[in-house]
Design a protein with these regions (language model features):
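Short, low-complexity cationic-aromatic patches
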Residues: 6-11, 61-72, 86-89, 123-126, ...
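Ordered hydrophobic segments in well-structured contexts
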Residues: 14-18, 72-74, 90-96, 131-133, ...
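Intrinsic disorder/low-complexity detector
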Residues: 1-46, 96-157, 161, 210-253
């Protein structure tokens, strides 16, 4: 299903590619950040290192595509994984390196849109330019944590937490908008936002979207996608060996 939509949009698959980065906040920045968790607001040191490392994964998947002569990586999926027992995290990006003759040959565009979403954009003359990533790390602060803890005993909004997440969201979105302006994009589409707890009163707000640009004469091959393209996939492999003993094979049937 996905392959049909991708090829019909003009993207011929070449190779499955990935880019990853394992990262740690580090001792020095950790000490600086630890003191700042006593106050409320963004911890710039943490935001900077998270933004830098996550862009490294994007840079590496782009380089993999260049090696095989592709000018696009489509359908990128991003996953953040813990490296068990090490205190580290890994950011992994997986996608399909492809060639689109309608796009410049000397650059590699990236997109985390589904093939169906990309087909729709292609149909109205827009091509993906680049995945945009914006990260903000915020601290609720010692005073805010105590206030929120007390308010958790009663129902209702925790204003301190609401305002903090709102501010972090605005900051992360501002980062991707600034990057979109820098590359001359016309729009940013498919924006997804995530909030994570990092411990020690810290939260990370992550925004991911795709910058797109109008391309003259660009369109999809078919007038519309056939219904089969939207058929749901089935999982044909299940591994429960690591989690269960005596698993009932008839469960769920």
């Amino acid at each position: 299903q996905d392959l049909f939509a991708q090829v019909d949009a003009g993207y011929e698959p070449v190779k499955f590619v990935f880019g990853n980065v394992a990262y740690s906040i580090g001792i020095t920045r950790g000490i600086i950040g630890a003191f700042k968790t006593l106050g409320r607001g963004e911890i710039k040191e943490f935001s900077d290192i998270f933004n830098k490392t996550r862009h490294l994964a994007l840079e590496r998947i782009t380089n993999e595509a260049k090696k095989v002569g592709a000018n696009a990586v489509v359908g990128i999926e991003t996953t953040i994984l813990p490296v068990i027992g090490s205190g580290l995290q890994e950011m992994l990006m997986l996608g399909t390196a492809s060639i689109n003759p309608a796009l410049p040959k000397d650059t590699v565009t990236t997109s985390d849109l589904t093939p169906q979403e990309m087909w729709n954009l292609n149909k109205i003359g827009y091509a993906p330019e680049k995945i945009l990533i914006g990260t903000s790390v915020y601290s609720l602060g010692l005073v805010g944590s105590i206030t929120s803890a007390l308010k958790s005993f009663v129902k209702g909004e925790i204003t301190e937490l609401s305002s903090l997440i709102y501010e972090a969201r605005e900051n992360a979105l501002a980062i991707i908008n600034k990057e979109a302006d820098a590359i001359g994009a016309d729009e940013v589409v498919g924006v997804k936002t995530y909030v994570y707890q990092l411990g020690s009163g810290l939260i990370e707000f992550l925004a991911i979207g795709t910058a797109v640009k109008k391309v003259q004469g660009l369109t999809s091959k078919s007038e519309q996608l056939p219904p089969q393209v939207f058929t749901q996939d089935w999982d044909t492999f299940v591994n429960t060996a690591e989690f269960n003993v005596g698993f009932d094979l008839n469960q769920g049937l």
